Amino acid sequence: MDGIRYAVFTDKSIRLLGKNQYTSNVESGSTRTEIKHWVELFFGVKVIAMNSHRLRGKARRMGPIMGQTMHYRRMIITLQPGYSIPPLRKKRT
């Protein structure tokens, strides 16, 4: 799984599953066309729309130094009716 890091399970993403929309975090350097092609090829589904937004990294303190976690991109993938993606594993914390 090159482009997709992990699935996102929030209240909104669970609500969107009823509309056949799947939410996941992807690598920040990935483009929409790369992710669309990868999802269609790997899962054998038909993607009709993709929405994405970039989320900023969070501030983290490491001793006296303030740092940041990496920025990441979140994609909401809409599939044609009749197609579905099996649940992706949840990221372990």
Curated annotation (Swiss-Prot):
**Cystine pairs:** none
Localized where?
A: Plastid, Chloroplast
The record's annotation in InterPro entries points to:
Nucleotide-bd_a/b_plait_sf (IPR012677), Ribosomal_uL23-like (IPR013025), Ribosomal_uL23/eL15/eS24_sf (IPR012678), Ribosomal_uL23_CS (IPR001014)
What's one Pfam family the UniProt record gives for this protein? Ribosomal_L23
Question: Per the record, what is one GO cellular component?
Answer: chloroplast
**An MF annotation (GO) of this entry:** structural constituent of ribosome
Keywords noted in UniProt: Chloroplast, Plastid, Ribonucleoprotein, Ribosomal protein, RNA-binding, rRNA-binding
GO BP terms in the entry: translation
Q: Where is the signal peptide?
A: none
How is the quaternary structure described? Part of the 50S ribosomal subunit.
What family, per the record?
Answer: Belongs to the universal ribosomal protein uL23 family.
What does this gene product do?
Binds to 23S rRNA.
Q: What is this protein called?
A: Large ribosomal subunit protein uL23cz/uL23cy
Q: What is the lineage of its organism?
A: Eukaryota, Viridiplantae, Streptophyta, Embryophyta, Tracheophyta
